[in-house]
């Protein structure tokens, strides 16, 4: 059977990764830090993925979960994978888009340098039993907190349930290449 080992580590502290064995077949990186502190968030998100990849460089595939928050705001037009990047979450999460872009950059660099088969998956609006953006909107409504909408209406989102992206993990791992699949 295919098992998973969940390991808790502080990716901002490279030394905390010393607990990791080096014989993983696959690594799935769902980690994200949104503290608002640029130094810490860049260390945890960008340097952290690099340190993790260096520690696990003999894997069959590395899957890094990113976000569509990396894209520059472009109105109502759908985004292609090669759409311009930008800091579109700055108002609510000052460090989020930038640290996600930085993490993707470090992920690509290490994959190329170490020849690690890698896929970067940019999820849109993930949600599930443990919460997500829509859950936070419901909490805001319960508390009478207004939900800001972008003035360029309508506001389109592509919710993605955890069951759906988990089902795709084997395909995302199979698509991994050292050139990096996005």
Language-model segment annotations:
Residues 4-46:
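NAD(P)H-binding glycine-rich loop region in Rossmannoid oxidoreductase-like domains
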Residues 12, 26, 40-51, 90, ...:
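Glycine-rich NAD(P)-binding loop of the Rossmann-fold in SDR/ketoreductase-type enzymes
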Residues 16, 47, 51-55, 106, ...:
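Conserved mid-core alpha-helix of short-chain dehydrogenase/reductase
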Residues 34-42, 73-77, 132:
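Conserved catalytic-core motifs of eukaryotic protein kinase domains, centered on the activation segment
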Residues 51-95:
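Conserved Rossmann-fold NAD(P)-dependent oxidoreductase catalytic core, especially the SDR/UDP-sugar
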Residues 105-157, 162-171:
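NAD(P)-dependent short-chain dehydrogenase/reductase
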Residues 173-177:
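Short, hydrophobic alpha-helical segments
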């Amino acid at each position: 059977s295919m098992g998973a080992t969940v390991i808790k580590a502080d990716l901002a502290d490279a030394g905390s990764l010393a607990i990791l064995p080096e014989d993983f077949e696959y690594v799935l990186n769902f980690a994200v830090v949104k503290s608002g502190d640029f130094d810490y968030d860049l260390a945890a998100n960008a340097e952290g993925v690099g340190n993790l990849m260096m520690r696990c460089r003999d894997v069959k595939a590395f899957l890094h979960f990113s976000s569509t928050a990396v894209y520059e705001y472009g109105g109502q037009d759908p985004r292609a994978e090669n759409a311009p990047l930008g800091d579109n979450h700055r108002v609510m999460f000052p460090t989020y888009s930038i640290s996600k872009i930085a993490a993707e950059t470090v992920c690509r660099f290490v994959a190329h340098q170490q020849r690690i088969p890698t896929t970067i998956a940019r999820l849109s609006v993930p949600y599930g039993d443990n919460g997500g953006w829509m859950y936070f909107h419901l909490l805001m409504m319960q508390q009478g907190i207004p939900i800001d909408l972008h003035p360029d209406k309508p506001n389109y989102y592509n919710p993605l349930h955890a069951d759906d992206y988990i089902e795709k993990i084997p395909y995302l791992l199979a698509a991994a290449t050292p050139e990096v699949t996005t």
